[in-house]
UniProtKB/Swiss-Prot annotation:
Keywords: Cell membrane, Membrane, Transmembrane, Transmembrane helix, Transport. The gene is nupC. This is Nucleoside permease NupC. Induction: Induced by deoxyadenosine and thymidine. Repressed by DeoR and glucose. It holds the Pfam family Nucleos_tra2_C. Belongs to the concentrative nucleoside transporter (CNT) (TC 2.A.41) family. It comes from the Bacteria.
Length: 393
């Protein structure tokens, strides 16, 4: 039965993308089928095989060491505030972002990341039926982040039509940045985080190919990556350290605000209607949770977490998943965890539109106009990845 429901779910989510398509007759079926097959193969390897366990284990172990090194710096500054017997979200989850961001800066300075991004993007362009710019952007978004990636493309932004701009922004919203992957791994199992990273990369291309199909002419398929201003090693290091700290503080501020507001709204709804706001959202999202393979008896609670992620952010939803006492089955936990690993939420519309507008005001206004369609597509990417996990777990 789970296979039947999962297949129906895939058809529904792809169908919802088709309904919103701006050019149904231009959709290229072959790349979509190839990428779906790759999603199933890679997802199965990562979740169900010894090779996958080895790769995920190595990835998680590496990040584990990085988090230990990050703790050295945190302990030095905050001393006794870090209690080994208690978990402080800001100290243990958010502040390591500072160290991870510093490492990314070093790898950028030494041209390691640009090399990896460029050639993985080139390989992806052979599979996804899109231009090299779109493929580069998807890989760069997964490493640099949804706003930082546009800085490397600022020369291209003014030359892009609305269709190509949508694809770039959709890729940025569907993925997550490497600087906060370590934070996710303190809240979710590493295998779910890694699987989501891979599935969302291809899922972003699949949904964008359906919602926003277009052909890139050979003469337009140019990739001119903006070289960063020449800086010394320590200038780059200092810049990325401060960027990492800004991210940690911004996420902390967003969490304080969103968690408090959701608690307030829940209190009002409980007093007036006898059910929390998140409970109502759970019923709204329950059919979608069911379609990704979650049993109906868990669908309402799972749907509540999924909806929380969309209206607030993934950190609030992950906190809800880990701390609210849900006793989900292993399969449901895997599906929900994979769904949560993306930037698909309302606040990301403002972040991406603001990042683009800071580089090109006209294009920033264009992004703001299709913001809801952007969130719609990115959310379908999360549902698609979750449905695939539901089928292969």
């Amino acid at each position: 039965m789970k296979y039947l429901i999962g297949i129906i779910g895939l058809i529904v989510f792809l169908g919802l993308a088709w309904i919103a398509s701006s050019g149904k007759k231009r959709i290229k079926i072959r790349p979509i089928v190839v990428m779906l097959i790759l999603q199933f193969i890679l997802g199965y390897i990562l979740l169900n095989t010894g090779i996958g366990n080895f790769l995920v284990g190595g990835f998680a172990k590496g990040f584990g060491y990085l988090l230990e090194y990050a703790a050295e710096g945190i302990n030095f500054v905050f001393g006794g505030l870090v209690n080994a017997d208690q978990t402080t979200f800001f100290m243990n989850v958010l502040l390591p972002i500072v160290f991870i961001s510093a490492l990314i800066g070093i790898l950028q300075k030494w041209k390691v990341l640009p090399f990896i991004i460029r050639y993985i993007g080139l390989a992806l362009s052979k599979v996804n039926g899109m231009g090299r710019l779109e493929s580069y952007n998807a890989v760069a978004s997964a490493i640099l982040g949804q706003s930082e990636v546009f800085i490397s493309l600022k020369k291209e932004l003014g030359l892009l039509n609305q269709q190509r701009l949508y694809t770039l922004c959709a890729s940025a919203m569907s993925t997550v940045s490497m600087s906060i992957v370590g934070a996710y791994m303190t809240m979710l199992k590493p295998e779910y985080v890694v699987t989501a990273l891979v599935l969302n990369l291809f899922g972003g291309f699949i949904i964008a190919s359906i919602i926003n199909p277009y052909e890139v002419a050979k003469e337009e398929d140019m990739l001119r990556v903006e070289e960063e201003e020449k800086q010394s090693f320590f200038e780059v290091l200092g810049e990325y350290i401060l960027d990492g700290f800004k991210v940690a503080v911004v996420v902390a501020a967003m969490l304080i605000g969103f968690v408090a507001i959701i608690a307030l709204i829940n209190g009002i709804f409980n007093a007036v209607f006898g059910i929390s706001f998140q409970g109502i959202l759970g019923y709204v999202f329950a059919p979608f949770a069911f379609l990704v393979g979650i049993p109906w008896n868990e669908a309402v609670n799972a749907g509540s977490i999924m909806a929380t992620k969309m209206v607030s952010n993934e950190f609030v939803a992950m906190t809800s998943l880990t701390q609210n006492g849900f006793h989900f089955s292993g399969r449901t936990t895997a599906i929900v965890s994979v769904f949560l690993v993306s930037f698909a939420n309302f606040s990301s519309i403002g972040i991406i539109a603001g990042a683009v507008k800071g580089l090109n005001e006209k294009q920033g206004n264009v992004v703001a106009r299709f913001g809801l369609k952007l969130l719609y597509g990115a959310t379908l990417v999360s549902f698609l990845s979750a449905a695939i996990v539901g089928l292969i777990y």
